[in-house]
Amino acid sequence: MTYENNTHQQNGAGTADIESRFANMSVQNGAAGGAPRKAYVPPHLRSQQQPASLNSSAASFSPRAPAAFNGNGNSNGNGNGPAAPAAPAAFQSFNRGAPRGGAGGWDAPSSGGYGGARNGGGYGGGARNDGFGQWKDGKHVPGPHNPRLQKELFGEEGDGLHQSMGINFDKYGDIPVEATGRDVPEPVTTFTSPPIDAHLLENIKLARYTNPTPVQKYSIPIIKLGRDLMGCAQTGSGKTGGFLFPILSALFTHGPPPPSAAEMAQGGYNRRKAYPSTLILAPTRELVSQIHDEARKFTYRSWVKPAVVYGGADIVTQLRQIERGCDLLSATPGRLVDLMERGRISLSNVRFLVLDEADRMLDMGFEPQIRRIVEGEDMPGVMDRQTLMFSATFPRDIQLLAKDFLKEYVFLSVGRVGSTSENITQKIEYVEDDDKRSVLLDVLASMPSGGLTLIFVETKRMADMLSDFLLRSKIGATSIHGDRTQRERERALELFRSGKTPIMVATAVAARGLDIPNVTHVVNYDLPSDVDDYVHRIGRTGRAGNVGHATAFFNRGNKNIVRDLIELLKEANQEVPQWLEAVARESMFGAGGGSRGGRGRGRGRGGASSFGNRDARTMNGPSSGGGRGFGGGYGGGMGGGLGGSYGAGAAAYGGPPPASNGGSYGGNSSWW
């Protein structure tokens, strides 16, 4: 025991002696004229130091006075200083401070940061040139130009990676447009300010968009007036810009909306929960990523911070992104529900709800999640938000959904809904399954070089097999399907977009919504069972007025869509092979007269019995005919019910309401 005690005492003395020596060490020891330095304190002894000894060195980390709240970054560099007593009055949708590692703050330190009421301090970008601006003193203050980011977002003229205007773009002026509803405003004809915010107009010019498409000509004034909208337009017609332009114009002009009650209850400073003011739902990872990329372009140098969340990717990375700012959120329904359950996103401050490719979301089984998001959480009701639904088709189930989600909307039909663009030259080849590979090689060899070719197949296994076959044939190809990891999918898309791999084999996962520039040829190696899917597949080419080619391999295994396919070809003024009409006559014997084959979700085309391209509210009488689609019996019950009162909720967003209304479209002059 004595030996052990002596040992402990010796060890204690030795430790103290070593610590004393460390404390007296200095890099200046022995140097002539060296200034005295503070003694080194080992980490385990630093807590024993008196706080007073740190006062002088901690001055730069002291919290600012309340009047200069958030003017300085905290120790993490997240741009948020200590909370001030007046925090609830200084609404913060989410952490809109500088990105991690920045100097922090809402403004330069001399201006007091984000202090006082909403029209006081800054609201938006950080101290470094991160491509964001601010909302300060009730005004939108664009950030400085960032050449590197600008090149990343908008590319350079002639780089081939950013398609904006095709050679047939002016023909869009001849496309018929039908807008039904009460007090539909006149369309715009050019990109001008007003109605488009001046800063957004600069970004549109950077994107080299010169003329609005038909859907944009109508959607911009409709959305500006605070109206709900159902927009039907052919693929590649500019639907994304059709809702982004008016939404961003309103946000740039009016600034962030006031905090919701839920936000105020938490003091407005809950950094762990995002409160987006705009929510865009889309069915696939690729589509929400594409929408987010467009949003990044048009929010460049603005106070609005876009974010994107989707399944199949690292959720921690996405959480970090929304922590840096989440004013405009693009999301897939499944991942959004996940983040809401985690308490990381609240929809209580949503003023704009956009459902893009709405019919495909329902086809993919997302209706329960969509209804939970819109009706089962804290999103404002239909009268207190503006809801926009965009898609290439609006079958019956979507029109029924509109009854619950939209208020006295404008129905916008641009061109023949569900039809294909005349810019696409369609060719149907009769090919037996065993001959498809050899015929594909002939088709690819006959096409001019320089463009991208997208080949659609029905199964994931076939996508990989066909891609391998092309590679063995010395043809550069890649594949994309649902079993690929998100990293693999993004890599394949990157190679395809850049032209390094000019051919991509895809399943339906890439069939909808993807806007890949310079796709000049689409091949339906396997025809889908529904003609709507065919429409969306070939819609990957001929976008924005450009000319495209579509080739389909047909055999008698595809008889279920032959009649709709013929009708589609005739609508687009395409050649109909005689053998295809012969197959159609064969299929008439023994075929039922009610619904289309395949999934049986037939939309019907033309005539009073179909309304995929018709406003259901105009169909008050019984439908004529009982043929394809679902014309029989639907019109009478739907006619008067989709409307409803429009006066109890939100007001006209971006200007005075139409004079014929006798007032605004809502109970208040604006959301602000």
Curated annotation (Swiss-Prot):
Residue span of motif DEAD box: 356-359
SUPFAM superfamilies: P-loop containing nucleoside triphosphate hydrolases
Motif (Q motif): 189-217
Record domain Helicase ATP-binding: where: 220-412
One GO cellular component, as annotated: spliceosomal complex
Positions with a binding annotation for ATP: 233-240
Parts of the chain that traverse the membrane: none
Polar residues: compositionally biased ranges: 46-55
Domain comment in the entry: The Q motif is unique to and characteristic of the DEAD box family of RNA helicases and controls ATP binding and hydrolysis.
BP terms from Gene Ontology: cytoplasmic translational initiation; negative regulation of cytoplasmic translational initiation in response to stress; positive regulation of formation of translation preinitiation complex; regulatory ncRNA-mediated gene silencing; spliceosomal complex disassembly
EC number: 3.6.4.13
Top-level lineage group: Eukaryota
One Pfam family linked to the record: DEAD
Family to which this protein belongs: Belongs to the DEAD box helicase family. DDX3/DED1 subfamily.
Cellular location(s): Cytoplasm
Sequence ranges assigned to domain Helicase C-terminal in this UniProt record: 423-584
Classification via InterPro entries: DEAD/DEAH_box_helicase_dom, Ded1/Dbp1_DEADc, Helicase_ATP-bd, Helicase_C-like, P-loop_NTPase, RNA-helicase_DEAD-box_CS, RNA_helicase_DEAD_Q_motif
Catalytic activity: ATP + H2O = ADP + phosphate + H(+)
Family annotation (PROSITE patterns): DEAD_ATP_HELICASE, HELICASE_ATP_BIND_1, HELICASE_CTER, Q_MOTIF
Keyword tags: ATP-binding, Cytoplasm, Helicase, Hydrolase, Initiation factor, Nucleotide-binding, Protein biosynthesis, RNA-binding
The protein, known as: ATP-dependent RNA helicase DED1
Annotated region described as Disordered, given as residue ranges: 28-88, 125-149, 590-627
Molecular-function GO terms, alphabetical: ATP binding; ATP hydrolysis activity; eukaryotic initiation factor 4G binding; G-quadruplex DNA binding; G-quadruplex RNA binding; mRNA binding; RNA helicase activity; RNA strand annealing activity
Gene: DED1
